[in-house]
From Swiss-Prot:
<dbReference type="GO" id="GO:0005886">
    <property type="term" value="C:plasma membrane"/>
</dbReference>
<feature type="transmembrane region" description="Helical">
    <location>
        <begin position="30"/>
        <end position="50"/>
    </location>
</feature>
<keyword id="KW-0472">Membrane</keyword>
<protein>
    <recommendedName>
        <fullName>UPF0391 membrane protein Mfla_0947/Mfla_1091</fullName>
    </recommendedName>
</protein>
<keyword id="KW-0812">Transmembrane</keyword>
<comment type="similarity">
    <text>Belongs to the UPF0391 family.</text>
</comment>
<dbReference type="InterPro" id="IPR009760">
    <property type="entry name" value="DUF1328"/>
</dbReference>
<keyword id="KW-1003">Cell membrane</keyword>
<keyword id="KW-1133">Transmembrane helix</keyword>
<dbReference type="Pfam" id="PF07043">
    <property type="entry name" value="DUF1328"/>
</dbReference>
<feature type="transmembrane region" description="Helical">
    <location>
        <begin position="6"/>
        <end position="26"/>
    </location>
</feature>
Amino acid sequence: MLHYSVIFFVIALIAAFFGFSGIAAGAAEIAKILFFVFLIITIVSLVAGIFHKR
């Protein structure tokens, strides 16, 4: 699960880059939302992975 969240976070970063740079102005809002959603998912997965190993 952590592996997938990192992959989706990278995809969100790429989408955010295109959205924030004006290349795809129509998709900027979607990229911003995806960036923060996957950032939260990544943090939750990292914390869950740390506590699961104990």
